[in-house]
């Protein structure tokens, strides 16, 4: 948890928390790089000892400025500033730049697209295969076994999906999100840039 001195420094920098005991920080955390931030719920903050390089090649100090962070983790050496709404239920990895964004959030019950049924398209015209009647006949027992097998596979897939669905938005290492209104229920890959 934060030390008493770190809490005082954060409050001096116009930061507040619903409960300072729910905020954890990395070893190289510096409260001087956090300004005008409201923390709600369990939040983890990484090291803020380094700089980040913008797409224009400008070196800026890492840190969090002008933001509301709710139940989220922020990795080492990120620059997060001017979040007009909030960052809610997100895991932000190291060296990310997130500036001038309204909201990043994860909503209740999201599946991140996992477990959705996708129907295949019919084959293009002229690509079909002609079957003769006796080649394609199936007995009722074969059809029933196939149906049962499909249902068993679907049930196994849905059990695995339910077990492994992420509960939070994830922003991987080095991603940049700039001047964007809303990111909801997303998994943003390493090095991705969103404008």
Q: Where do the protein language model's features map onto the residues?
A:
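Domain-scale signature associated with acetyltransferase and cell-envelope carbohydrate enzymes
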Residues: 1-195
